[in-house]
Amino acid sequence: MSYYNAYEPTLFIMVGLPGSGKSTFLKRRAHEFSTSRCGYTVVSRDAIRFSLLSDTDDYFAKENEVFKKFTQEIFDGLKVGKDVFADATHLNEKSRMKLLSGVLDCQKNNLDKHVCGYQVAVICMDTPLEECLSRNAKRKGRQLVPRQTIISMSNSLTFPEATDMKYAKVYYI
C-alpha cells in the first residue's frame, strides 16, 4: 500500500453497482473518512447529469459534458485543499483511470497554474447483487436503473486489491 498522508487532500473514488449504497454511505459517513482541515465535498455524477438533462433527453445524451463538469468539480475541490468524494460507479480500473486522467487534464488546463497535490483512495461498496437489485427496485423516475443493466454491470465490477500501489488506501465496505 502506498504512503497515506493525512495532511494532503484525498480524492476518494467510490466503487460499486447502482443500489450498492454509495450515495447513502457518503451522506452518513463521509465525515469519518475526511482528514482535510479544509473539509470535504461530494461530487455526484448523477446529480450533475440530472441537472444538465431535460426530461426528454436520453440518459447518456450529454455524457461528454457530464464527465467534463464532474472532473472539473473534483479538481476545484482538491485545488482548495478539500477532500473530494467522487460519487459514481467506477466499476473497473479503466473507468477509474479515465477519471484520474480527466482530473489531470483539468489541472493542466488550470488558468492560474496552481499545482494541486493530492492522493487517491478507493472506497469499495461490496454489496450483494440481490441487495442492489432490491434497493434499485424502490427507486423512481430516472434514478431507476434497468434490472438487466445492473446484472450486466455486475459482470464488469472489479475492486482494486488492498495492496494496489496506485492508491494511498483501499477501503472495503
Task: Pin down the residues of each PLM region.
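Active-site loop signature of alpha/beta-hydrolase-fold enzymes
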Residues: 48-50, 91, 130
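Residue-level preference for the first positions of well-ordered beta-strands
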Residues: 9-13, 41, 81-85
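Glycine-rich phosphate-binding loop used to anchor ATP phosphates in small-molecule kinases
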Residues: 61-121
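Conserved substrate/cofactor phosphate-moiety recognition/catalytic segment
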Residues: 24-82
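A structural signal for isolated positions on well-ordered beta-strands in alpha/beta enzyme cores
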Residues: 41, 121-123, 171
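A short, structured active-site edge motif that brings together acidic residues
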Residues: 46, 123-128
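Conserved GTP-binding G-domain of TRAFAC-class P-loop NTPases and closely related GTPase folds
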Residues: 2-4, 8-15, 20-23, 28-33, ...
